[in-house]
Amino acid sequence: MNEFQRLCALLKVCYENLLILHHNLTGDPAWKGNHEWLGDWYDMAANQADDLIEIGLQMGYREPTIAESLMIFPALPADNRLWPETQTITMGMFTQLTEQFEKAQTGTPDCVINKLQEYQYAW
């Protein structure tokens, strides 16, 4: 699996993990706002994954399955979490995503690099 495919795999797992965090946020006085942010972030991960997987298919790359993705990147357990823990996990995901976006640019056509940089900036 190349770095572009690893990015697609990471986006799939981040989507699922953000969904878990979204559903299991508890005991937060700012629950509504933080819950909405988590929803926005998992939507963004899903949309970026969809777009980049389709671009990868056009470049001749095979889509990583969720099973393959989970062999590389861990899924979170569906545990209730307070906002400080959720925020720490989320920021770690964002860091991992921005690093993987950087790696995915190697050997990728310029027109795709522009899209990767646009998406990377969003995180």
What is each stretch, according to the model?
Residues 71-123:
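Acidic/histidine-rich alpha-helical segments that form the ligand environment
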Residues 5, 9-12, 16-19, 39, ...:
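Generic structural signal for well-ordered, non-transmembrane alpha-helical segments
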